[in-house]
From Swiss-Prot:
InterPro entries: CDK, Kinase-like_dom_sf, Prot_kinase_dom, Protein_kinase_ATP_BS, Ser/Thr_kinase_AS. PROSITE patterns: PROTEIN_KINASE_ATP, PROTEIN_KINASE_DOM, PROTEIN_KINASE_ST. The gene is cdk2. It catalyses: L-seryl-[protein] + ATP = O-phospho-L-seryl-[protein] + ADP + H(+); L-threonyl-[protein] + ATP = O-phospho-L-threonyl-[protein] + ADP + H(+). GO terms for cellular component: cyclin-dependent protein kinase holoenzyme complex; cytoplasm; nucleus. CDD domains: STKc_CDK2_3. This is Cyclin-dependent kinase 2. Serine/threonine-protein kinase involved in the control of the cell cycle; essential for meiosis, but dispensable for mitosis. Triggers duplication of centrosomes and DNA. Acts at the G1-S transition to promote the E2F transcriptional program and the initiation of DNA synthesis, and modulates G2 progression; controls the timing of entry into mitosis/meiosis by controlling the subsequent activation of cyclin B/CDK1 by phosphorylation, and coordinates the activation of cyclin B/CDK1 at the centrosome and in the nucleus. ATP binds at residues 10-18, 33, 81-83, 86, 129-132, 145. SMART domains: S_TKc. Phosphorylation at Thr-14 or Tyr-15 inactivates the enzyme, while phosphorylation at Thr-160 activates it. Activated by spdya.
Length: 297
């Protein structure tokens, strides 16, 4: 660790503190994530080390690069490339008119490229949210924390006891499904797509049942027709209130027909019918995709 000089604390992630740091030898600025594990006494599980080491192979322009893994005594530090802002801060700080459609389209296209790459390597994210999508002034957006959920699990609370957000969690996870697929990341990205357009979280639930009911109120309560097999899921209840599906023109009014069609395919209840990242990249919505640059604060 003596190779790195901490410059400042930049945040508290799901697993531990994140610092901006400087590599003393090269002068390179990096993000240093200190992973806090419950197993402080036993040291770092070897399975976690193996999982994390595999992530060093994930090289893609839309994936935040894991540069190094430093394992000392019972602590684990992950060294990542540094980007100056996350999408949540950018959305919170952008002017009243919000993010331009051209920039939303560019960001969504890049994120789908990153997802398609990871999914082709059988790596899931499982915890996508605006806070772990990082941007720079060149107009790039990158997925951070890929694969950490598999290595460390997704905790209910962070190490500082903050509740881990449910807002972007796919309905199959909320209904207790133990075996899920790359489709969970597409759902999360669909929620983020809508949020970039409207500047409001699509399903801001404050408990698992509130989260489900917010989804049901918008997309309609699922049944065996809209989602074959839903009634056999562990946490499905036949007593769920029956809501009808809302028209997407009311849910995301600024979006054109192509955008609404893509969003509807990303928010399909049945994960087998949910669009894949690879197919989404060919959607007509991206016919005129360009690469504008954001005005970062």
């Amino acid at each position: 660790m003596e190779n790195f000089q901490k410059v400042e604390k930049i945040g508290e992630g799901t697993y531990g503190v994140v610092y901006k740091a400087r590599n003393r030898e090269t002068g390179e600025i990096v993000a240093l994530k200190k992973i806090r594990l419950d197993t402080e006494t036993e040291g770092v599980p070897s399975t976690a080390i193996r999982e994390i080491s595999l992530l060093k192979e994930l090289n893609h322009p839309n994936i935040v690069k894991l540069l190094d893994v430093i394992h000392t005594e019972n602590k684990l530090y992950l060294v990542f490339e540094f980007l100056n802002q996350d999408l949540k801060k950018f959305m919170d700080g952008s002017n009243i008119s919000g993010i331009s459609l051209a920039l939303v389209k560019s960001y969504l296209f890049q994120l789908l490229q990153g997802l398609a790459f990871c999914h082709s390597h059988r790596v899931l994210h499982r915890d996508l949210k605006p806070q772990n999508l990082l941007i720079n002034s060149d107009g790039a957006i990158k997925l951070a924390d890929f694969g950490l959920a598999r290595a460390f699990g997704v905790p209910v609370r962070t190490f500082t006891h903050e509740v881990v957000t449910l807002w972007y969690r796919a309905p199959e996870i909320l209904l207790g499904c133990k075996f899920y697929s790359t489709a969970v990341d597409i759902w999360s990205l669909g929620c983020i797509f809508a949020e970039m357009i409207t500047r409001r979280a699509l399903f801001p639930g404050d408990s698992e049942i509130d989260q489900l009911f917010r989804i049901f109120r918008t997309l309609g309560t699922p049944d065996e027709v809209s989602w074959p097999g839903v009634t056999t899921m562990p946490d499905y209840k036949s007593t769920f209130p029956k809501w009808i599906r809302q028209d997407f023109s009311k849910v995301v009014p600024p979006l054109d027909e192509d955008g609404r069609d893509l969003l509807a395919q990303m928010l399909q209840y049945d994960s087998n019918k949910r669009i894949s990242a690879k197919v989404a990249l060919t959607h007509p919505f991206f016919r005129d995709v360009s690469r504008p640059t954001p005005h970062l604060i």
